[in-house]
Amino acid sequence: MNYPHPIIAREGWPFIAIAAVIALLIHAIGGFGFAWPFWLLLVFVVQFFRDPQRPIPAQPNAVLCPADGRIVAVETSHDPYANREALKISVFMNVFNVHSQRSPVDGAISKVEYFPGAFLNAAIDKASTENERNAVVIQTASGKTVTAVQIAGLIARRILCYVRAGEPLSRGQRYGFIRFGSRVDVYLPLGSRAKVSIGEKVYASSTILAELEQ
């Protein structure tokens, strides 16, 4: 499947344009000696908003990682968005990770719900319940419920979600973006088998988080 998005996220285009204009102006006025920090800033901004295509595993019961980052939680927890006990797997994204979110499974969206909140460090547990967040609840064709929650962080204060209830999602499909690092919680049915461990580095779409019970 071709990735239907530019490798530099559209969300970053205005920032890249501003950084490029500033670097060009400083270079024109003072030469490279004055402008090199701004060229370096431009390189950082471009790198920050990269959004590369990733291979998608073919395994039908696989739950794919929704974001790049590091695993900070694998535990049984209450899923308040689907009102159930669930296996919760949390991915923390730092400022150097890719910041787009991609669907963990194929399915139909049953609910999208936004919650205002605080902006605590997204790596800590209480960020899941106290920070600003946006939950997407997905029903698979086999009747399984998978909840993916975008969570704002200490620096990240803008959650973007591009899907609505009733729409279909394909695994690996890009559905959201959070600027400047944050967290994504995934809630899965009890009986799902986690395939990652705390501290592990993971990649959106290409890392298998868990396997749904068949």
UniProtKB/Swiss-Prot annotation:
Pfam families linked: PS_Dcarbxylase
TM ranges: none
InterPro entries, alphabetized: PS_Dcarbxylase, PSD-A
Catalytic function, reaction form: a 1,2-diacyl-sn-glycero-3-phospho-L-serine + H(+) = a 1,2-diacyl-sn-glycero-3-phosphoethanolamine + CO2
Subunit composition and interactions: Heterodimer of a large membrane-associated beta subunit and a small pyruvoyl-containing alpha subunit.
Family label: Belongs to the phosphatidylserine decarboxylase family. PSD-A subfamily.
Protein name as catalogued: Phosphatidylserine decarboxylase proenzyme
Gene: psd
